[in-house]
UniProtKB/Swiss-Prot annotation:
One of its GO terms (cellular component) is alpha DNA polymerase:primase complex. The keyword Nucleus applies. This is DNA polymerase alpha catalytic subunit. It catalyses: DNA(n) + a 2'-deoxyribonucleoside 5'-triphosphate = DNA(n+1) + diphosphate. GO terms for biological process: lagging strand elongation; leading strand elongation; mitotic DNA replication initiation. Keywords: DNA replication, DNA-binding, DNA-directed DNA polymerase, Metal-binding, Nucleotidyltransferase, Nucleus, Transferase, Zinc, Zinc-finger. GO terms for molecular function: chromatin binding; DNA replication origin binding; DNA-directed DNA polymerase activity; nucleotide binding; single-stranded DNA binding; zinc ion binding. Polymerase alpha in a complex with DNA primase is a replicative polymerase. A motif (CysB motif) lies at residues 1404-1427.
Amino acid sequence: MFHLLLENEEIQFSNSFAQFYLQVDEAKKIFDEIDDDEYDKIQDQRKNDDFIVDDDGYGYRDHGGEIWERDDHPEDGGKKKKKSSMYVFSFSPKFIAQPLFLQPNEQSITAFMKPKSTINRPGAVTNSSAQIKQKPKVSAEQSKDIMNNLFQELDSKDVDELQDVNNSAVVTELNKPIAFNQNDMLTSKYAVTLETRQEVEQKRVTEQIQAQAQIGQNQQSSNPFSKKRKFEEISTNQNANASDSKRVSNQTNDNLNKVETQVISMLKVANPQIKVTSKLARMDDSMKIDQTSAQKNQIEQTVNHSKLQRYNQNQMMSGIKLDNRTSKPIRNLEIWNQVLANTQEFPLPLNENGTLSFYWIDAHEENNGTDLYIFGKIYQPQMRQFVSCSMKVNGMQRELYALPKMRGKARGALTVEEEKQQVRAVMMELDDIRKKRFPQISKWRCKPVNRKYAFEMPIQHGEHQFLKIKYDSTMPPLPSTIQGNTFECIFGSTQSMLELFILKRKIRGPCWMTIKNPTKVTDFKKTWCRQGIVIDNPKNVEVTLEDLNKQELPPLTSLTFSFKTTRAQQNTNEIAMISCLINTNIAQEGPSQVERTQSFTLLRKLDGKPMPYDFDQKVKQRKENIIQKFENERQMIEAFIAKVFIVDPDLVVAHNLCGGMFDLLLARIQYLKVNHWSRIGRLKKTQIPNKKLDFGGSSYGGSQWIPRQVTCGRLLVDTFLSAKELVRETSYDLTYLAKVQLKKDRQDFDDELLPTLYITSERLFSLIDHTEKDAYLTIQLMNHLAIIPLTLQLTNIAGNLWFRSLQNARAERNEMLLLHEFKKKKFILPDKKAPFAKDFKRNMFADEFEELKSGKGPKKGGKRKKAAYAGGLVIEPKAGFYDNIILLLDFNSLYPSIIQEYNLCFTTVNRRPTKNFDGSEVKSQFKAAGTDANEGNEVEEADLPDKNVNVKDAVLPNVLRDLVQKRKAVKEKMKNEKDAVKLSQLEIRQKAIKLTANSMYGCLGFGSSRFHAQAIAALITKTGRDTLLRTKDIAENKLGFNVVYGDTDSIMINTGTNQLQQSLEMGKRPQGLKLIALYKCLEIEIDGVFKSLLLLKKKKYAALKYEGFGTPDAKVVQEVKGLDMVRRDWCPLSKNVGNFVLNQILSGKQREDVVLNLNEYLSDIGEKMKNNGITLDQFIITKQLTKAISEYSDIKGQPHVAVAQRLKNQGKSESDLVNNFIPYVIGAQPFDPSKTNPALAGKAYHPEEVVSSKGKILLDIEWYITMQVLPPITRLIEHIDGIDVEFVAQCLGVDPKKYKYHSSEKKTGETNNDDGTLIQNPILQTETERSLKGRTIAELTIKCPHCSESYHFPGIFQDGKNNTLSGLLCIKCTQPIPEAYIQNRVTLFLKQLLTLYYQGNKQCQEPACGAVSRQLLYNNKCINLACKLKNDTRYTEQKTNDTLRYLQGLFNVKKYIQENQKNGCVHKTVEEVPNFDAFARMQGKVDDIMIRSKYNKVDLSSIFNFMKLGKQQ
């Protein structure tokens, strides 16, 4: 028998040799076939060869063995493999020299590193070559004894165990279901129930007994490796002839290559740290063939079984079918490249009059406006298709306007001669400044013009005279802060040439243009477009309005791609795979056929590791897409860029493209120094931009974003950003959007698991399919949301750049729309202020702009900036569960309607200037002392303009009015349109108009907008609040509705009925005369119908909503707003229980049935939790490690950090932990046994620690119940009668007494009538008083001195016969209670009340926690580090005041009389009330405290103090 030892460093050599061997012709001899005697002679010759000169027999020697014989590493089980002395073949007579300098009586280092069984005995001489020569040969009998001993050692394990050395780890990995994300991996790995220590110990004893019973029952007769098979039984096979040896050798190597190499390579790819040692015994022909075939069959069966198991368990993309895609490529990319390369030789397709029809898509300026490029498409008749074309515009000129400085007279009061002299003085001063300070500006032209102004600088609104200056754009612009003696400031110095070009040529979005006198570019092209032209004058560009406007818009080419990334050893993200879909027929005005796509996938090896052995073969069998494999990342990215250039897409589409994908691609391009990287865009560049902002130029829309600089000429479509603008969802990741919008399932993917998917071809193909389907879902989402046609319509309305509409730059859209309108009316336009790096972030415009809808300020430094003015009104909700229909009435575009209703515009609202001439902010004289400069400004309240004012110059209302009329016209067309395609186009257009109109208000309050007018924005929101309050008053007092909630522009009313049609009729009543008589432009209508509603707090509710109400196809769906049920710091069990409780509450069942179902379900959950009936994965909590472990100041209160610290101590790299989610569970025992009261972090464990502890670590079930299960349930049942926290706690099996306090707080002053039937109609009967009593800190309790009955003091009350009774009588024994005792109780009650208030205790919002403290922590965090919620003031000013008012109500006899008169009860005078004097004296005590309180007082002198100061001035 011969052993071939394959160590880690030799596996690649073996694999490469096997490939080399397969390529050699069989006629050539690779091996020398010799017998044992000849081989022994060769070994002796090697040992005798003294190949180191003059070393005196020391140091270097050759043992005569082969390279694969070194067995310095232990095998599995800690045993060393014995060296065989018999060999069959040799690669080549290479010498393996081992350096060692030996001192006398010392052994060699080789002997030191060898196993003990192979080290020479102390008596043996090892350093003399002469003695090595005299080594005696081993006899045949001794060889037999040695081989028998070897077999006995090898057969100590069964054959299956020997095979496990090679493939057990692989089979274990393959049998696992494919997990694309960490949650799936945790679920599949830890879906096991935990065992107690006793169960583990009992199981261990049982296994030992069974193991002992199986000793001696091995199937040795059928085992070819049985230890009973002696050396004699196989000795005859060793004397086989040369042909037999050759046949055995070939079969052995073939099996080795096919089986062992596959297993070992997969192991190394799965885990590079696995130490693989393969062992193959050379046997006779039949035995060897049987063994290897059996091993191979076993592996194949195991793998096939695992594949079947995997595909059954893992439906990763159910519902997605790519069958409609063309199986054949649309075009061969190489042929396509050759054809398109010839387009440069084609002439320009000029019209008969010599003009060129050019459809423009994008534009870009370089070098501070010197170079202006327009990108678009032209029709190439030779190719019968549209090709890309670039146009460079020369001859642009800057336009500046200088405002003359007034001296002595007001503007408009000068004579014509004085105006001429004033303008001449400005001209001379500016020309002098040009010559001295700006010699680069060689010449310019000037002339006086009349322009209007209506913005925020201290310039009187109206028409004034300006000096207009024009000069070539190749000269530098003047600074915006320049001022002189004769002029105040200069407008237009920061305006980009692209913006000026769009405004001057009146270009509103992508359209056909007629180009006059175009010149084709043949040499030194600056772009990657197929064609290029140059024009010398911007006036040669005209928007086509008539003939060509009827021409259909050219189709666009899109390239949709998706990445898979991996983490490199240097802790950097690398791209491992790119899948792309190509579509050459994207429609601009309607839906596109996304099924006709060509796909290709590029992938590379991971860190040089081999691919699966059969991957190339299976790639050839796949015909539906193109898969290309590369050796490294650079080759793959270069191929990707090359294909982008060949395809030349107009649209580059991806999900979350702007959120990191493109940044990663550019980072890898820069790091790997990829060639021709600028082909990603259409403008040739040599240096990769490395700054987020381009401060060097006045680029369009301010500074530029890096991906924009790289991809100019192509449009970036990020479905993540577009979805945020077009749909309102709780999440915008691809998985959620695919499920909600496309009704298709997708599995999340974690990059950490990517190496495990490179093990086999099946797994790798599943990863390829996942990546390709991500791209397919992305383009489907783009088509489903109509992103292309919708953003095109938005761009055509606003007149901005298309790429900015795709980036959700709503503020910029509004800017451009207003710029077009004000430019048309000859207004001086406000300058664009340069943004700062800290303000320029991805989606900056969208984020800040969105916040202005609710009156919130933009984010600053990661925190919300305090609102400079009040936002929308939120009516206090009447929290509770409503099981009848709730109507949601909503104003149609409230803020735009207010602008039209009151004619609000820059030109009509009188306000103070907010900017100086140098652009700095004017310090507000209304700002309170000590107020921060950036926060808390008191905005001047402007007055509504007179409605009778001329509205011709009111630009903003006219723009909105025009948009509303256009939308109405489109809706009218939709009613009569029967063509589905045209109907879809009209729907997209009316939606675009609506989005534009609704966002116009935002530019007024957006601080970075050029049209920022805070006073107008504050006036609009104030009017909106007044409108909502007036609507609520009409609904309640005139229409008799019960308004339960209101927010900004909508109210919820309780219809009190369960009939849908009846509730809809009620919803039409507010649309009647009541509101129409008040407003002309404001309209209110039904926006939603809720079958049932669980209203908890502001902006937090859950409901069953009628979808498509008013139609026969109406259905009920569940809608949840603001209820955070998917936080990662809740374990899956908590989420499941919370969802079940919510579904039961909204189910519509009877209250008794709901309580019964909850009791049964929660009791079952509690029982399973205590009896280990729930799998471990349901208890796992995950939380992200956002920074390095050392940066966390306190680890005790952060369990995930403590677990990460232990993982790091166990050898896991910190780079693999940071920014990843750490899973953990909470155990019942502390991690450090020396701690008696450990923090939560001391009880946190990684799930693997729990599984490997064998029952030593148990979960803290009580903690999970109190901190994970109870809190979400408590918030849901807080306002539901019949269900309280005590009930839930009892169901879950915990002590309900702990939650008695929270349950009592929930009750709203219910009175116990079991013993006293006298309390029938207490005085606190109105809804206000009942809510007041429920908001009190405590109620006045007294104890009867006669019968010792304790009860809440009722004050003045009536019996059932309307007889007024005094509260000074005991409700049980009816004995009088002394007045002095009542007064003493009132005094003590007031003292305790004020003491509680001034203590200022803070209490945690979490009922299960309830921690109370007087400490003030950052951000009001709970003092309990294990808790996640915040503290609230326990006894607030409002509660204290409500309690005092409650006491007043107990003793206020006059109010009692008034209430009785309202209710039609018996009229009594004050004197007729029993114990009137006593009640008056006790009320006086309360009144004294109320008078000293300033909570319910308004200091008018401080409010109107500014008027007093104004008079003094």
